[in-house]
Amino acid sequence: ATHGTGNGTIENDNGINFAASNVGGNLNATATLGNITESGTEALTVTGTSTFTTSASDADITLATTTNAFTGAVSLNTTGSGGNAEVIDASALNLGASTVGGTLSARAVTGDISNSGNLAITGAATFRTDADGSNIALDSSGNVFSSAVTLQADGGGEAFGNITFVDSAAVDFDSSASANGDLYINASTDGAVGGNLSVTATTGNITQNVALAVTGTSTFITGAA
């Protein structure tokens, strides 16, 4: 724990297993050879930004306690196709610049999901909001999703508010996340958005294999020359 706005930095030659921790400033954690995990249901509370990095190929980051409280942006960095990352925030989740070699699972229990830095995700990515009518805004211009992306409203049983999504390649609306480029809006009705929908494919096409039901405005942008 730190007092006031003090920062916390930890680097371990092996893995890191967090007990319950409170950091008033920023947290920077690097595991050189192992995984980064949390002990049981003990939560991390970080007022500033949080950066978690595994240096070994295929090492994971698993921050899956539902009472984690990350007030600032959370950055996740792994290497190797088996280097997966999972993060849960008890309220809203803001993802900072992150590079994940495997899959990414990001969940906000009571708030929205957004990103304040570019996301480069090699494996499949799932973004889940549990609160009905919550928003997902993945709008950084340098986002690179190399595999399929699922936007999930509480396990597919609730409705979204607004969705903003930017990818460097093509985007294909689909009823599942089975192929590279698929964007699966998994709500109470698949493809349904209760607010506004904005999707940008900076270098590819935008296509669909599932009907979209958008209550608000819809904006589709392709940036390729």
Q: Where do the protein language model's features map onto the residues?
A:
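Extracellular lectin-like interaction modules
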Residues: 1-225
